[in-house]
Amino acid sequence: MTTNGDDEGPTMGDVTSAAEQWSHPAEDVLANWPYPPEGGWTADDLDRLPLDGPNGEPDFFKRVELIDGALVFMSPQKRFHARVQHGLHVRLNEQAPPELRTVSQMDMRLDREWRPCPDLAVIDTEADDDNLTFYPPEVIHLVVEIVSPESEHRDRVVKPPKYAKCGIPNFWRIENNENKPVIYVFELDPATSAYGLTGIHHGRLKVELPFPIDIDLADLPF
């Protein structure tokens, strides 16, 4: 996959070994709730959050991501969002080569203060592990965000530059046009560490990266 510079990025082991310096002790994570722990929230704090809230609220921390050091609670999905996410997940895995795999709603630990949870990502198959709670950017070839009303600013403005800076070579943003998906396809320019728009796809998605893809957007599986 595309990387920036000549130095090799950190390995999975390097990223995992950084966990202790990127997290607080489990008992301290919610000690100051609703304020963050001393030093602010870190990417590995998300692994230490309980499922239920500090006052027993069920599934309070079930859908949360870390964006620039702030906890972001994600709203329930609308049917359009769930349908497109599932359909693309199926189609991408049908067409992917053996060395690549599509995953849905898995965290990406980009650095100490960033752990977003994109709707879909294409990763190296050899990096997949049922015990992981996140993937590092070095194994990610494509990130897909499906825009919802509450996530418009994050998906359009906040997240893409960070994905690009971390060297993720491909980014798709999916918009809802009268309950039909419109896919904006971006490719990384390694010279500037920024994305450039390479196409807007209505009805049919046909691209060559991160692998040859041809999907009828009107015929996504439910």
Regions found by a protein language model. Name each.
Residues 2-222:
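Gly/Pro/Ser/Thr-rich low-complexity, intrinsically disordered segments predominantly at protein N-termini
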